[in-house]
Amino acid sequence: MRYKWVISLTVVASVCQAADFKIEVNEPRQTIHHFGASDAWSMQFIGLWDNEAEQEKIADWLFSLENDAQGKPKGIGLSIWRFNLGAGSAEQGKKSKINPGTRTECFLTKNGSYDWNKQPGQRKFLQMAKQRGVPYFLAFLNSAPVYFTQNGLATNTGRGGTINLKDDCYDDFARFMATAVKGIEEHDGIHFDYICPVNEPDGHWNWLGPKQEGSPATNREIARLVRETSKAFIKQGLTTKILVDESSDLRCLLATHQTSWERGYQIRTFFSKDSTNTYLGNLPNVPRQMVGHSYWTNTPVPYMREIREQLRDTIAKYGLKFWQTELCIMGNDEEIGGGGGYDFSMKTALYVARVIHHDLVFADAESWSWWRAVGEDYKDGLIRVYTSDRMKSGYAVDSRLMWALGNFSRFIRPGATRYVVSSSAEFDPYGVMCSAYRNADGRWVAVVINYSQSVQPFSLSISDGQKYEWQMYRTSDVSGETLKPVGKTAGKQQLPPRSITTFISD
């Protein structure tokens, strides 16, 4: 009841008076390293299409930093691309017990040799990303290669909550990751800056076998695997950083959630020296940071801020950094009808923009990534693809969701610093939200979300008194407003309803 009272009060305030926002130049926060998305699972198919024009269109939407003749961005300029390093379920076919659309190939073969012709569709998009200037690449795995797993599969099939990896294969799995990363660099010229050996090891779906690749793991199993991976990468002379642990839920980083102590309290488990069995802070290629996913923690809306502030404070306590590496719409996101059925409109775009704002402003996330770059009839893709022949061919349609991410990713570039923004109004997650950044070239960027159904008066200024002319780029449901340049301003504007506007200083 208390939350409802606060919300109603702030909505009234935002309607009745202008929202004055000031960038506080003496209050820098975190460095922003990148914004991204993953190639799972569509790119393995799209990268093999005969229609190269469609591939180029998708790549431009995701990666391009160019503008058209009218000054409108051609794409959203993602700065990190997540590559799903496969486990071999595709070679198993129906015996994999995994849906055809989510199986993956593996570079490692049954006889122990490596086939560098595998995963060609995904590797084509690695090249297309690099050609368009994407500076960072991350490899992630959902399962060990099937030759190393306890059940011979890349899915868990309800076998329990421990890692699906033979006890004598930890070093083999680590060696595979190092060899695959080195091989892709040698064959394709793609350097992986980061690798995540496990993905959502605390997710209860991983225990059941969800008809996609995945494996649970306890904290001790993760620590053992990361130590082996660290040794394998050092032995092969690789500079790739090893990340932990792509948690399925922010609550698992802080405490236990729908699981036991063996999978909870991950921040202190991996980065407190008191955790002698699981401490990873002494490994030279494991950065002091936690990587997690923002699923399940976005409702009720007041809780979204609360859990992220708890995360920020705990991360700071242990001297760490935080990256958010996956999000899509799930069943509990009831405000926009859950994940089923694709949505091209601002309804989903604004909902996700609000989550991005919370992750950057209240959790101090230094990196932010969406889940799938391309999907079908579910709210998990930035781009919607249509196919009638099981992804052998098709065509793609962009969404307001993709362009809304672009309001951040296209303009906030690697190395930017976020700054505190003060306001004359109370924070209102149903009204106007503003976050501000300064790129390495000195230009200011402010991303302003108007979540409300009405026009909102807005004023932007800087605490040092400097005056700027701001170029504005807007995404809304208005036809053609997808990162559209909509003019310049000295700082005072009427924000259209249900819109996102990025302000760039001159």
Question: Which stretches of residues belong to each language-model region?
Answer:
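N-terminal catalytic cores of secreted or lumenal carbohydrate-active enzymes
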Residues: 21-192, 205, 212-223, 227, ...
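Aromatic/acidic polysaccharide-binding cleft in carbohydrate-active enzymes
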Residues: 321-410, 419-427
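Carbohydrate-binding surface patches
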Residues: 425-468, 498
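Structural recognition of the beta-strand scaffold that forms the well-ordered cores
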Residues: 33-39, 79-85, 136-140, 193-197, ...
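Solvent-exposed beta-hairpin/edge-strand motifs
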Residues: 463-480
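Noncatalytic carbohydrate-binding groove/subsite architecture in carbohydrate-active enzymes
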Residues: 182, 212-355
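Hydrophobic h-region of N-terminal signal peptides that target proteins for export
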Residues: 9-17
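C-terminal beta-strand-rich structural cap/linker in extracellular carbohydrate-active enzymes
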Residues: 484-506
